[in-house]
UniProtKB/Swiss-Prot annotation:
Keyword Metal-binding among UniProt keywords: no
GO cellular component term of the entry, any: small ribosomal subunit
Protein name in UniProt: Small ribosomal subunit protein uS13
Source organism phylogeny: Bacteria, Pseudomonadati, Pseudomonadota, Gammaproteobacteria, Cardiobacteriales
GO biological process: translation
Disulfide bonds: none
Xref: PROSITE patterns: RIBOSOMAL_S13_1, RIBOSOMAL_S13_2
Subunit structure and binding partners: Part of the 30S ribosomal subunit. Forms a loose heterodimer with protein S19. Forms two bridges to the 50S subunit in the 70S ribosome.
Organism: Dichelobacter nodosus (strain VCS1703A)
Role of this protein: Located at the top of the head of the 30S subunit, it contacts several helices of the 16S rRNA. In the 70S ribosome it contacts the 23S rRNA (bridge B1a) and protein L5 of the 50S subunit (bridge B1b), connecting the 2 subunits; these bridges are implicated in subunit movement. Contacts the tRNAs in the A and P-sites.
Single Gene Ontology MF annotation: rRNA binding
Keywords per UniProt: Ribonucleoprotein, Ribosomal protein, RNA-binding, rRNA-binding, tRNA-binding
Pfam families: Ribosomal_S13
Length: 118
């Protein structure tokens, strides 16, 4: 197992697909990382040399991924809630933030239905 950004990247997958297992790296960013590191995107991780894996590590370290990114996102949400802006209030009340309807849908965000007690 190759270890990049503190994550065991799957060795049986192509470099582009394997990089997407790191939080904060999608397909387009994975292609960009492979291009910067001069690694063929269709080459499997187990077939990469140590220098190529090290080049991938070096390029990935330039981006904010995994724990740092999770911390940044949670701090951004906390900042919105502290400001008391509309988006922060929606986060605080566990409701959809981006204008979706809530009369009939939004069950994932609101949680299971609670019966009305009479």
């Amino acid at each position: 197992m190759a270890r990049i950004a503190g994550i065991n990247v799957p060795t049986q997958k192509h470099a582009v697909i394997a990089l997407t297992s790191i939080y904060g790296i999608g397909t387009s960013r994975a292609k960009e990382i492979c291009a910067k590191a001069n690694v063929a995107p269709d080459k499997k991780i187990r077939d990469l040399s140590d220098s190529e894996v090290e080049a991938l590590r070096q390029v990935v370290s330039e981006y904010q991924v995994e724990g740092d990114l999770r911390r940044q996102v949670s701090m951004d949400i906390k900042r919105l809630m502290d400001l008391g802006c509309f988006r922060g209030l929606r986060h605080r009340r566990s409701l959809p933030v981006r204008g979706q309807r809530t009369k009939t849908n939004a069950r994932t965000r609101k949680g299971p239905r609670r019966p009305i007690k009479r």
